[in-house]
Amino acid sequence: AGYIGSHTVRALLQQGHSTTVLDDFSTGHRWATQGQAVIEVDLKDLGALRTALAGTTFDGVFHFAAKSLVAESNREPQLYYQNNVDGTAHLLTVALENGWNRCVLSSTAAVYGNPITDTLGEAHPKNPISVYGQTKLAMEHLLERTCADHPFSAVCLRYFNAAGAASDASLGEAHDPETHLIPTALKAAAGTGKPLTIFGDDYPTADGTCIRDYIHVEDLANAHLHAMNYLA
């Protein structure tokens, strides 16, 4: 029921799929579930998760459930490891118990840390510099091990700076509180938000400041569907 997950639900519905939304609604929004079946449960509570999902059958799991604020992760590392890593371990435990065998993980380019090349590929070293990035890499490792030990397949998508809204304006990003770069930059430029600090002045650009890429959230949602179709 978060930003990227809700747009992925929308994309699934457009292709005729039925969905079940699993969320504890600590940051997600009920209005974003778009009338789909909802299971409200905390991934950190393995017992409650087992009870809520006992006997369920799903063709695949899209895993978006993770805390994602870099600064907060460095202040509260235990919270991020408990939520992101323990939560993923519990989800995979229940998946194996119920016979689900496909997962697409919402990972992050933060697993790379400070890049040593302009273009990031699969072989680029993974050296996250934030606790958030470390927990996402640990989530990837859990999936990798699960795939090695069980008849299970997974894809991890490493992205950053999702932006935009549904093309028909029916769905978009919740901005209270605002935590994402692009809306923050737009508000700063419009004079309706706090000034934005830009770090670095020696990049190979006209004014020496860095250039940030982004991906539209609808393209990102469709990428998740393509990844799941690949696993099928």
Each model region followed by its residue ranges:
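N-terminal Rossmann-like NAD(P)+-binding domain of SDR-like oxidoreductases, especially those catalyzing
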Residues: 1-165
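NAD(P)-dependent short-chain dehydrogenase/reductase
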Residues: 144-229
